[in-house]
Regions:
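Conserved N-terminal beta1-alpha1 strand-loop-helix module at the mouth
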Residues: 1-99, 106-133, 152, 159, ...
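Glycine-rich beta-strand-to-loop/alpha-helix junction loops that act as flexible
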Residues: 137, 169-174, 190-194
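Mid-sequence acidic-hydrophobic segments that form the walls
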Residues: 138, 163
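Glycine/threonine-rich flexible loop motifs
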Residues: 145-149
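Internal alpha/beta core interface subdomains
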Residues: 185-189
Length: 222
């Protein structure tokens, strides 16, 4: 994927969370939820699974990949390079404590997307140097989804965007209500979890987020 295409696909980056299944979740399956998110305007899907067995993760990844491929939406796998490789997903997103970026690149190849989570300018510059295609920076706002995520100020987010040439996505607690605070920060888009997948109307919620994200993104190119 070319850099311009990648940047465009990062506008509304939806990260799955099966924790909402059977609660406020409006869908029977994660596949249904992903389809609704895409129909609402999600520009990229990250499949994030922390609690299920590897085989179940792999099966789910194949199901989600089929949906994403049919809608021409990139699929990124969270952390698991093996599953990203086996499913031929568009790429993988790794954290600071996960597999080394260079090793992931060796396994996946030059054409695949590799994103890296960062919280400091130093981490961002190192990830860029090591060949990251984009950065996920956060948590910007408090979040219950990732209890171990440290907070990153909007000021630091801006510093990171200025320091690197690769696109940056803001992550952590982002919602329709607080997204406007990120205007002018330099990000390519926002990564959201509960603002999409915890909603009764996933398609409608995603549509509203997409509209706001478009205004946010356009403000950066002025």
């Amino acid at each position: 994927m070319k850099s311009a295409e990648l940047k465009k696909s990062l506008l509304l980056y939806a990260v799955t969370d099966r924790a909402w299944l059977g609660k406020t979740f409006c869908c029977e399956t994660l596949s249904d939820a992903v389809l609704q998110a895409i129909e609402g305007g999600a520009t990229l899907i990250q499949l994030r699974e922390k609690e299920i067995p590897e085989k179940e993760f792999l099966d789910e990844a194949f199901r989600i990949k089929e949906i994403c491929a049919s809608k021409k939406i990139p699929l990124i796998i969270n952390d698991n390079v093996k599953i990203a490789k086996e499913t031929d997903a568009c790429g993988v997103h790794i954290g600071q404590s996960d597999m080394e970026l260079k090793e992931a690149r060796k396994i996946l190849g030059a054409e695949k997307i590799i994103g890296v989570s960062c919280q400091t300018v130093e981490q961002a510059l190192q990830a860029e140097k090591n060949g990251a295609d984009y950065l996920g920076v956060g948590a910007i706002f408090s979040t219950s989804t990732k209890a171990d995520a440290g907070n990153v100020s909007i000021s630091t987010l801006k510093e990171i965007c200025r320091a690197v040439k690769i696109p940056v996505v803001a992550i952590g607690g982002i919602s329709l209500q607080n997204m406007s605070q990120l205007k002018g920060s330099g990000i390519a888009g926002v990564s959201v979890i509960s603002a999409i997948f915890a909603q009764q109307d996933i398609r409608g919620a995603t549509k509203e987020l997409k509209s706001s994200a478009e205004k946010l993104f356009l403000s950066f190119s002025e």
